[in-house]
Amino acid sequence: KATGGTYYALKDGQPTGCNPFQLPDSPKTREFIYRLVGICGKNAEGRVTAAEEKQIQLAVDTLMNTIDFENRNFSVLLQSIPPEPTKADNLRGRLSRWCRSEGGRYAWCLDNTSNDFDPDNFYRIGFDLTDILKDDYLPTEPVLAYLFFLRDLMMTRVAAAGGILATVIEEFWYPARFKITQDFMLKILKTDRKRAGWVILTSQSPEDAINCPIFSAIVQQTPTKIFLPNPDAQYERSYDQTGITQKEYDELVKLTLESRTFLIRQSRQSAFATLNLYGFDDEMAVLSGSSRNVAILDDIQDEMGDVSVDMWYPVFKDRVRQARQAKRQKAA
């Protein structure tokens, strides 16, 4: 947002502005929507039956072929799913959880009156998914899938224009839990570099990254790796799977967290580098967000509305400084 982009914080229980049925229609979009609706309609075993897949396909095709663009949504789609009153567990009942017309608990996720996310208009965009990324939480997988699909559409547009698209996936191991987002991530790694797309995958916990189901593919497809200090690290069954040598590891674990030094490894070459950002307090409030600073930004936006960065950023800096000073005085 500070560089002229758009920043969205998706909040649990609040309308996301996501409506996949109002994306531009194409065979690619339809295939994605079939799969997305199937994810929302999974039974207790985590799947839909072949007959249910057919119902989903017919319902999606009916919606996209016969309903005006502005009226396409999850609730209208549900009208094409036949009720099965003799079955306690049925597709219509499962999909009702995602529909406003049924008072569905998760209707805020994908059943919005309009789609606020047009990949043709994206330039720089960021999403805060802190509220959405939860274990055993039904909205996590479909919301992630939708955002990854938007990114895929954006990549197609940027590639056609001869541009470059950079993607940063924080805590990448979390979306890699799900098959649909695994597929998107592998596509990014394997094919998007040919379309001038590149990706940064980050994780605060090496163990979470290493336990990722597609970690071996990620290691093979990422030529450059950066390792931050981790004095408590282990080599065997941990860092040895990342491709660094024992010698590199031995030097890495000697580093303290305060050293500001890290290991860069590319192919068979490696080097240690230092990045000291002392004195960059104002900039760090933007480069590395915190819940406190995000709350400050939210308050400013509520007060000032959607104004240019030149107007809100000076106010943001002042309030962050005030909050920092108040914290220091309290600790003194």
What are these regions (language model features)?
Residues 1-197, 210, 253-257, 262, ...:
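P-loop NTPase motor domains
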Residues 209-332:
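C-terminal regions of RecA-like/P-loop NTPase motor modules
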Residues 203:
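H-loop/switch region of ABC-family ATPase nucleotide-binding domains
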